[in-house]
């Protein structure tokens, strides 16, 4: 039987700091090997003199955390390498995006997210049931 890995990540904290709240789902059919893509990505980083560090957009854009001391050019090159890797990898993704100012409360936002996530899962039900 095939196996599907689903990775879920969110971006945009609660409260007033971020304008948007994003919920991303990355789906990877484990029968589709990504090892060569990872090796190629790591080689590309090494050739360009870039560190192989986890990609986190907010710190990358602001030169915080693991990106401190990196120039804007280095951070742009890192993002370009990762983008190329992501485009070539055999996985798919879905992103739910919400403008936080459109909701009266965090509870309203979460209710909308829950409904949207249920609809998304039902839209993908046939595909998901194949695993």
What feature does the model see in each segment?
Residues 1-131:
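Phosphate-ester processing/binding pockets and catalytic centers
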């Amino acid at each position: 039987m095939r196996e599907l890995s689903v990775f879920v990540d969110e971006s945009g904290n609660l409260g007033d700091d971020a304008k948007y709240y994003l919920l991303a789902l990355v789906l990877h059919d484990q029968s589709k090997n990504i090892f060569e893509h990872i090796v190629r990505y790591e080689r590309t980083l090494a050739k360009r003199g870039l560190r192989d560090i986890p990609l986190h957009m907010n710190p990358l854009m602001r030169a915080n955390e693991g990106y401190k001391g990196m120039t804007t050019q280095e951070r742009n090159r890192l993002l370009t390498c990762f983008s190329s890797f992501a485009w070539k990898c055999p996985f798919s993704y879905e992103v739910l995006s919400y403008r936080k100012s459109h909701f009266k409360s965090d509870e309203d936002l979460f209710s909308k997210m829950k409904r949207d996530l249920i609809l998304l899962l039902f839209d993908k039900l046939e595909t998901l049931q194949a695993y």
